[in-house]
Amino acid sequence: MTVRIAINGFGRIGRNVLRALYETGRRAEISAVAINELADAAGMAHLLKYDTSHGRFAWDVRQERDLLTVGDDTIRLLHIPEIGSLPWRELNVDIVLDCTGVYGSRADGEAHLKAGARKVLFSHPGGHDLDATVVYGVNEKELLPEHLLVSNASCTTNCIIPIIKLLDDAWGIESGTVTTIHSAMHDQQVIDAYHPDLRRTRAASQSIIPVDTRLAAGITRIFPKFNDRFEAIAVRVPTINVTAIDLSVSVRDAVKASEVNALLHSASLGAFSGIVDYTELPLVSIDFNHDPHSAIVDGTQTRVSGQHLIKTLVWCDNEWGFANRMIDTTLAMAASGFSLDAAASIKL
């Protein structure tokens, strides 16, 4: 069965999802039938073809009116602001990938269902009333047919959760702190300009800028037992892609740095292959650009203090890695099964 998807929002994640669909050879499993984006069609096609972070898209891209052709595939382009007016029923859409970064509530998801979609996957953390939050590689096997509205969590949650699980299973995590060192994002300013967050009024290319993060809440969402046991802070740095995460955890059992690295290296070759990677090469952030893994452990930076405090440095391409997990989770949602009429299950 080929899963029919529509992408709502064709920004950084939406475009990377479509590129990943073709570049990773999963076009036989997933067919993109429509993209909804308020920007003009010519701009959508241009930014798909030419990307500052990820280079030129190798597939032939053509656009005529509101039709986008990628290779031999034709995708309908929509410019509809209201979810309820989207033609998902007409297009027989199985799963909507909502990549707007704006929508994420149950009401938003139900609007997609009422429009005819069978399931919805949000590309960012959603409300607590969604049916499930998935970090692929950790809990996607818990998906059920009745999970219609799903969040793919965040890029940083996808990066750190597999590492937390591995360390906790091996030595028992008691508490932890996380520092996200994140590339600049679209909600920052090119030059100083007004923003409700005064730190984000400053030019993104000239400063390391502390910002709020809900990563600790994201950890608790996946592992409720860590409620009030993790804290997180975040800074934005003057690069356009790739993120590093500094994870420190206090563990119950004594451990050596060499044992931590052995565990994480083994996991990258085994149970977490394709999700976690491991390196001891002297690399820098740009070297992880366009890397499809959720997390890449830098073994040269692993430290253990007093046998019970572990510090690790984990890299991720916050765009490309996350876009690949969007595709993985889409396939997992389809594999879990569909109800006969998603819209009929909504409590009106």
Swiss-Prot record:
Oxidoreductase listed as a keyword: yes
Alphabetical list of InterPro entries matching this protein: E4P_DH_bac (IPR006422), GlycerAld/Erythrose_P_DH (IPR020831), GlycerAld_3-P_DH_AS (IPR020830), GlycerAld_3-P_DH_cat (IPR020829), GlycerAld_3-P_DH_NAD(P)-bd (IPR020828), NAD(P)-bd_dom_sf (IPR036291)
Cellular-component GO terms for this entry: cytoplasm
Binding residue positions for substrate: S154, C155, T156, R200, T213, R214, R236
Class of enzymatic activity (EC top level): oxidoreductase
Site (Activates thiol group during catalysis) residue list: H182
Main location: cytoplasm
Keywords linked to the UniProt accession: Cytoplasm, NAD, Oxidoreductase, Pyridoxine biosynthesis
Pfam families: Gp_dh_C, Gp_dh_N
GO MF: erythrose-4-phosphate dehydrogenase activity; NAD binding
Top-level lineage group: Bacteria
Gene Ontology BP terms: pyridoxal phosphate biosynthetic process; pyridoxine biosynthetic process
Pathway noted in the entry: Cofactor biosynthesis; pyridoxine 5'-phosphate biosynthesis; pyridoxine 5'-phosphate from D-erythrose 4-phosphate: step 1/5
Database matches in PROSITE patterns: GAPDH
The enzyme's E.C. designation: 1.2.1.72
Coiled-coil intervals: none
Catalyzed reaction equations: D-erythrose 4-phosphate + NAD(+) + H2O = 4-phospho-D-erythronate + NADH + 2 H(+)
PANTHER family documented for this protein: GLYCERALDEHYDE-3-PHOSPHATE DEHYDROGENASE 2
Described purpose of this protein according to its UniProt entry: Catalyzes the NAD-dependent conversion of D-erythrose 4-phosphate to 4-phosphoerythronate.
NCBIfam families in alphabetical order: E4PD_g-proteo, PRK13535.1
Similarity-based family: Belongs to the glyceraldehyde-3-phosphate dehydrogenase family. Epd subfamily.
Protein name, UniProt field: D-erythrose-4-phosphate dehydrogenase
Species this protein is from: Erwinia tasmaniensis (strain DSM 17950 / CFBP 7177 / CIP 109463 / NCPPB 4357 / Et1/99)
